[in-house]
Amino acid sequence: RRVSDPEVIKSWCENIELDSRLPLLALHEGKVVAISSLLQNKGGWKRHIGRISQSILPKYRQKGIAGKLVQELVDVARMAGLQKVEAEFIDKQEGGQKLFALLGFTHLLRLEDYVQDMQAINHDYVLMGMDLKTDEEYAGMG
């Protein structure tokens, strides 16, 4: 499913499962220009890890929108008690990797020619992640 497809976004909005997928949208003149999502597995060996995915229209890149959406989702993940967040990229998504690095993510893994794009061209798979630390000042406050 292509996250830039308006029908995919519409389906997500109509079937929101906030306990496992939290989407944040950026709108301009009533049009979705960016979407970021925090995905969480409620069971299994990755239940403590959230995954952030993002898509932003090229015209709206380099304007600070993506960084604000990602930072908001990192904060939500921390408040939800997740211990880590991760993000997946292909090698040519260098701008996204740089943004996530600026926000505190580190490169965890790179698998050469592991994934294919929509045109069946092989790319390196890149996994970035961040450990979420609880602010000691607020720990234990309910």
Please report, for each region that a protein language model flagged, where it lies by residue.
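Acetyl-CoA-dependent GNAT
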Residues: 2-59, 131-133
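Residue-level preference for beta-strand/loop junctions
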Residues: 18, 48, 81, 122-124
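Short alpha-helical
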Residues: 7, 94-95
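C-terminal "cap" of GNAT-fold acetyltransferases
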Residues: 50, 113-142
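Conserved catalytic-core motifs of GNAT/GCN5-like acyltransferases
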Residues: 86-89, 101-123
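Conserved GNAT acetyl-CoA-binding A-motif
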Residues: 70, 77-89, 99
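Conserved acetyl-CoA pyrophosphate-binding loop and the N-cap/start of the following alpha-helix
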Residues: 60, 64-72
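Amphipathic alpha-helical recognition patches that constitute DNA-binding helices
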Residues: 51, 95, 102
